[in-house]
C-alpha cells in the first residue's frame, strides 16, 4: 500500500491513514470523559476492557481469555496496567470490551442504554463489544474515503470476517 498507494481504515473507520504519505486523513476519538466511564461500566459487569497504544494492547485484566484472543488476532503484545482509566491520557479511537459470549447481548444492551447519544457500542464477534465515538462505522468511513479520492461505490469492494463488517460489505456491494 505504501508503494502503489492505498489507505488503511482502522478502528472501525474511526481512523483513515494514507499509507504512501503516512498522513492521517480522518481521526475520530472517544470523548476523554468516556474512558473512565467505560472502564467503570466494565468493572461493574466484571469483564475486561482494553484499548491500544503504540506498543500494543493495554488492559488491566491481562490474563483475561478474551482479551488475549485480541492479542492473538492482532499479533500485538499485552501491556498490563493497574488502572486503565488513569493510564489513558491520550486520544483513543476505540475501546474493546471482552467477555464470555453468553453475556455479550445483555452487556451490549446495557452499554448501549448507558452510553446512548455519547458513544456507539456494538458486537463485533461473539466475545467482543466495540465502543467507538458516536457515528463511527465502516460503511461511513468508506464513503468518506471514496469522496476524498473522487471515486464511487462502483470502484469499491470490501472484505471482512466480523459482525461489524456487514455494513461495509453491504455498502460496497461486492465483498
Language model regions located:
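Alpha-helical substrate-recognition element adjacent to the catalytic core
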Residues: 1-27, 32-33
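Short, well-ordered alpha-helix to beta-strand connector turns
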Residues: 5, 13, 92-93, 172
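Conserved acidic, metal-coordinating active-site core of Asp-based
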Residues: 35-37, 41, 45-159, 163-171
Amino acid at each position: 500500500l505504501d508503494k502503489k498507494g492505498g489507505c488503511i481504515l482502522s478502528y472501525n473507520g474511526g481512523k483513515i491513514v494514507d499509507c504512501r504519505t503516512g498522513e492521517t486523513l480522518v481521526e475520530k476519538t472517544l470523548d476523554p470523559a468516556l474512558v473512565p466511564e467505560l472502564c467503570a461500566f466494565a468493572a461493574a459487569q466484571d469483564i475486561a476492557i482494553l484499548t491500544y497504544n503504540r506498543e500494543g494492547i493495554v488492559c488491566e485484566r491481562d490474563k483475561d481469555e478474551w482479551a488475549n484472543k485480541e492479542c492473538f488476532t492482532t499479533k500485538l503484545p499485552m501491556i498490563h496496567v493497574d488502572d486503565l482509566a488513569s493510564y489513558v491520557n491520550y486520544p483513543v479511537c476505540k475501546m474493546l470490551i471482552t467477555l464470555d459470549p453468553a453475556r455479550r447481548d445483555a452487556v451490549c444492551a446495557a452499554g448501549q442504554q448507558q452510553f446512548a447519544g455519547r458513544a456507539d457500542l456494538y458486537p463485533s464477534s461473539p466475545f467482543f463489544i466495540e465502543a467507538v465515538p458516536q457515528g463511527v462505522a465502516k460503511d461511513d468511513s468508506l464513503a468518506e474515503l471514496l469522496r476524498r479520492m473522487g471515486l464511487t461505490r462502483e470502484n469499491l469492494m470490501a472484505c471482512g470476517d466480523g459482525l461489524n463488517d456487514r455494513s461495509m460489505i453491504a455498502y460496497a456491494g461486492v465483498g
